[in-house]
């Protein structure tokens, strides 16, 4: 089976040809651990989990190494710890635990390695000193900066004109820079801010810049070059562009990673998600209302490279779909491996640039087959095994029902709020919205009953 993936570097679908098929290597940029992860953060986690599962099927579980870093040194972390009056270590440990719990609820496999930036300072210093020695970086006022003009094909990934790169680089304008595009590899730490012995003979303790962290961790765990580098589309520039510059110039290689993959943006009910708009929602908040599997199916219903509009209606549809699928499989065990033709059909579709919408459409077809054919026992096992490749249907019908009720029991306040919204919509004669709320709740197993006195009560239907 040939795996073709869209490569941001070439702007085309390329066939993955691992540098070493016995050791396929993938790096994905992970979270900065200072707060609860929002639903936008869940998209790359789920997308690259699906790719990890597919790679393991194609090359063998013991032949794929998936590295997703943890950024635990960052100015946002310092500010949040000071705001909360706790130590930086306590903050990063707490938020990393939250992230682990959230991703487990989304049924994501643990990466092979989850390196922390603070545990790779030595590798960062080594890279920085190598870049200075080769003329690609320089020391200025206790900072070390990468000199962008030293790399003739800088910008190859993002393909932005120079003026756009300068405008979008988010770099500080400092008089000690040789060029406005130059970016920080190392900076001094003020009192009370984490600091380590600096490279290049700088006497003041300091801390790394953001970009050098990923270059160091990918080098330490995957080598100078590797197969796949992934992340959100917002990381193409400047983060991934700068990673490439650092790594290629340090190791004198033509590429850092063969494939660069990026997932699209997430919108919330048609709007950009932001705290200022009051529509910022965390994974944990959504998990209080819906089983994680619902979030996962809703996320995979849109192709990973396309923008996704995250809506309650979409979540309701995903919940209804899973309800039907679990009813079909009942308590069946999954049949996995090459002997399951359903799983092979799913793998074929995923091999076309992780075409999860096509996979889900085909799963709907397989569900109908498993539901109506006479040899339904074997077909149910195969259907479940096929869905497992997408990280779905890992439970039994009994377990699914229990998780639904558990989510509902945790969220009576949310249900009450939706009922109030529905009553307001009915009063305003917005019957379409009122019906939509009823359907959303029904998808979660909540049945509404309109009473003669104008109030609405509810009960769990399953």
From Swiss-Prot:
Catalytic activity, as annotated: tRNA(Cys) + L-cysteine + ATP = L-cysteinyl-tRNA(Cys) + AMP + diphosphate
Motif 'KMSKS' region in this chain: 272-276
Coiled-coil residue spans: none
Pfam families: CysS_C, tRNA-synt_1e
SUPFAM superfamilies tied to this protein: Anticodon-binding domain of a subclass of class I aminoacyl-tRNA synthetases, Nucleotidylyl transferase
Claim: Nucleotidyltransferase is one of the keywords in the record: no
Alphabetical keyword list: Aminoacyl-tRNA synthetase, ATP-binding, Cytoplasm, Ligase, Metal-binding, Nucleotide-binding, Protein biosynthesis, Zinc
Cofactor names: Zn(2+)
EC class: ligase
Biological-process GO terms, alphabetical: cysteinyl-tRNA aminoacylation
The organism's place on the tree of life at top rank: Bacteria
Residue span of motif 'HIGH' region: 31-41
Binding site for ATP: 275
EC number: 6.1.1.16
Subcellular locations according to the entry: Cytoplasm
Protein name: Cysteine--tRNA ligase
Taxonomic path: Bacteria, Pseudomonadati, Pseudomonadota, Alphaproteobacteria, Hyphomicrobiales
